[in-house]
């Protein structure tokens, strides 16, 4: 694991030095990314707080969709892939359905999605060197459980969005420290 991470870093550094004309704006935004992360997570939490009560009141199920195994994937070697897949899952499957459940929350769900898209964009710009080829079994389990819940899956997934934000934070904190 450590040797492959070192190899990725060396490849990245070689690529950075070998590519003349790279804009400093991108480099600067990446160096500021760790400092901006708490602000981006706060924006996600603020946006979620506007719809949290609605979805948690509608979520009548006792089971947990975002289990500890997902957090373990976030913290493990599949962290990049698990995060990428979960962001895609929320943006493409959960939020489009969530927007259609009540016209009063549509704008707030849309705002939450825009904040998540902003985070994804920053991650892609600054963390492209992370290995993201393998599929996460925990993400597949989340998607399968979501599908089985049918309409109730939207309430479950949206009511647990704060857990997803916490997992993002755990993943990014770990990556920033390394």
UniProtKB/Swiss-Prot annotation:
Example of a GO cellular component annotation carried by this entry: extracellular space
Keyword field: Cytokine, Disulfide bond, Glycoprotein, Secreted, Signal
GO biological process: one example: immune response
Disulfide bonds: 30-126, 80-132
Annotated signal sequence range: 1-18
Annotated compartments: Secreted
One GO molecular-function entry: cytokine activity
Matching Pfam families: IL10
PROSITE patterns in the record: INTERLEUKIN_10
Glycosylation-annotated residues: 134
Keyword Ribonucleoprotein: no
Keyword Signal: yes
Family per similarity comment: Belongs to the IL-10 family.
Subunit structure: Homodimer. Interacts with IL10RA and IL10RB.
Protein's job: Major immune regulatory cytokine that acts on many cells of the immune system where it has profound anti-inflammatory functions, limiting excessive tissue disruption caused by inflammation. Mechanistically, IL10 binds to its heterotetrameric receptor comprising IL10RA and IL10RB leading to JAK1 and STAT2-mediated phosphorylation of STAT3. In turn, STAT3 translocates to the nucleus where it drives expression of anti-inflammatory mediators.
Record PANTHER family: INTERLEUKIN-10, INTERLEUKIN-19-RELATED
The protein's name in its UniProt record: Interleukin-10
Origin organism lineage: Eukaryota, Metazoa, Chordata, Craniata, Vertebrata
């Amino acid at each position: 694991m450590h040797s492959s991470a070192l190899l990725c870093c060396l490849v990245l550094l070689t690529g950075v030095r070998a590519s003349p004309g790279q804009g400093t704006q991108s480099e600067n935004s990446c160096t500021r990314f760790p400092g901006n992360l708490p602000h981006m997570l706060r924006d996600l939490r603020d946006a979620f707080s506007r719809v949290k009560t609605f979805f948690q009141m509608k979520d009548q199920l006792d089971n947990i969709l975002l289990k500890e195994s997902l957090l373990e994937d976030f913290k493990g070697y599949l962290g990049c892939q698990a995060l990428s897949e979960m962001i895609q899952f929320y943006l493409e499957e959960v939020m489009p359905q969530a927007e259609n459940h009540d016209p009063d929350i549509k704008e707030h769900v849309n705002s939450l999605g825009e904040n998540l898209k902003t985070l994804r964009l920053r991650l892609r710009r600054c963390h492209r060197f992370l290995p993201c080829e393998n599929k996460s079994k925990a993400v597949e389990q989340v998607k399968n459980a979501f599908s089985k819940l049918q309409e109730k899956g939207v309430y479950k997934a949206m009511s647990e969005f704060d857990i997803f934000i916490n997992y993002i934070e755990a993943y990014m904190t770990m990556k920033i420290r390394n």
